[in-house]
């Protein structure tokens, strides 16, 4: 399998991995909300004084539940991203090895993944003592073994500058305020408790089956928007780990790669900035890197020294390449049950847009163990 083929296969698989993590966090959030909604429905049987007292208790329960969710979700993200960083570090190493001319793969220096990496990604403050930018330590890192650890905490924040921990906490606090305002205003305006609960929960049921898209579609005011935000945070963080792994391998091997190509082929609703950057070549540490925005799926490709011209002349999109392959390769990349879906998208949209539509509609999931079985960990080779 070629270096470019592996890159896009990896991007599709990471999308499925982010679906898996998002679904777990979304279901936990929705369970917390539904617990409170069930308590809210009991207010109808109470008199006005008891109703006010009970409402305060219900809102306190929501705050406690969502604060607990934020804490447990932060820990879950630490565990998930730690494992993912190990896999992606190995994958980025193999990508550079396969792009080099024959006989040079063994000279690629690898990156050690620190056990404290995930804590840095999820909780590190940009101004925390001891946190150093990647660019600040470029010379040191070029001559010494790289440890992917707390020194990268500053770089691994979300596009708005927040850490994952901050994003989850602020989202929980905001939704408690919105829920409280919605319920209180509804009661003041004479709306029935039943109508209020339908508005905040939508048609969502406990243990709701289906993809994350279908769960969001069934949700109400207290779940649909937060569920979308959870998915955006997870997807952005997963892509950031992958992108940073690519960058670290380049920093550790400056004599092997001097440039990278920005690749935005899998961005379904490609932003103006990613569309403008797609296919452009930049020197390492001097150009833009993903994620440029929330839910960004763009990646970078490290270009081996001396092959800049050949890499810059590659114009075939991944959709075009994939459509020319036999069905076995298509099944390996897309999944054994999705070949018919792919063929239908190609007929309707053409191969380039078909791959983007496919990723957008693909609600399937992969956990870390399944990613390993797909060949990303060294232990699975």
Give names to the regions the model predicted.
Residues 1-216, 307-381:
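N-terminal leader/targeting and assembly helices and adjacent pre-domain segments
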Residues 214-313:
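Acidic, glycine-rich two-metal-ion catalytic cores of nucleic acid-processing enzymes
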């Amino acid at each position: 399998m070629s270096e470019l083929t592996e890159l896009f296969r990896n991007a599709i698989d990471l999308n499925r991995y982010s679906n898996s993590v998002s679904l777990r966090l979304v279901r936990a959030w929705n369970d917390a909300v539904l617990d409170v909604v069930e308590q809210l429905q009991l207010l109808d049987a109470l008199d006005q004084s008891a109703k006010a007292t009970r409402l305060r208790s219900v809102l306190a329960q929501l705050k406690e539940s969502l604060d607990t969710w934020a804490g447990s979700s932060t820990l879950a993200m630490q565990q998930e991203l730690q494992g993912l960083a190990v896999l992606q570090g190995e994958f980025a190493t193999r990508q550079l090895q396969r792009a080099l001319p024959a006989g040079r793969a063994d000279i690629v220096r690898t990156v050690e993944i620190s056990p404290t990496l995930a804590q840095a990604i999820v909780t590190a403050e940009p101004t925390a003592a001891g946190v150093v930018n990647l660019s600040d330590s470029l010379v040191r890192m070029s001559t010494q073994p790289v440890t992917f650890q707390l020194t990268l905490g500053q770089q691994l924040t979300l596009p708005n500058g927040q850490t994952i921990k901050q994003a989850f906490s602020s989202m929980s606090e905001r939704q408690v305020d919105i829920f409280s305002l919605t319920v209180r205003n509804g009661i003041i305006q004479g709306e029935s408790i039943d109508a209020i609960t339908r508005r905040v929960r939508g048609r969502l049921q406990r243990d709701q089956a289906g993809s994350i898209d279908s769960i969001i579609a069934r949700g109400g005011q207290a779940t649909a928007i937060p569920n979308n935000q959870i998915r955006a945070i997870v997807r952005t963080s997963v892509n950031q780990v992958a992108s940073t792994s690519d960058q670290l391998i380049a920093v550790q091997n400056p004599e092997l790669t001097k440039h990278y190509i920005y690749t935005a082929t899998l961005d379904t609703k490609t932003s103006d900035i990613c569309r403008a950057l797609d296919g452009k070549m930049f020197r390492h540490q001097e150009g833009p890197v993903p994620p440029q925005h929330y839910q960004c799926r763009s990646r970078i490709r490290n270009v081996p020294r001396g092959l800049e011209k050949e890499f810059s002349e590659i114009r075939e999109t991944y959709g075009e390449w994939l459509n020319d392959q036999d069905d076995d390769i298509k099944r390996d990349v897309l999944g054994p049950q999705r070949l018919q879906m792919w063929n239908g998208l190609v007929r309707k949209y053409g191969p380039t847009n078909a791959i983007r539509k496919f990723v957008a509609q693909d609600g399937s999931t992969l956990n870390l163990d399944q990613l390993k079985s797909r060949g990303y960990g060294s232990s699975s080779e």
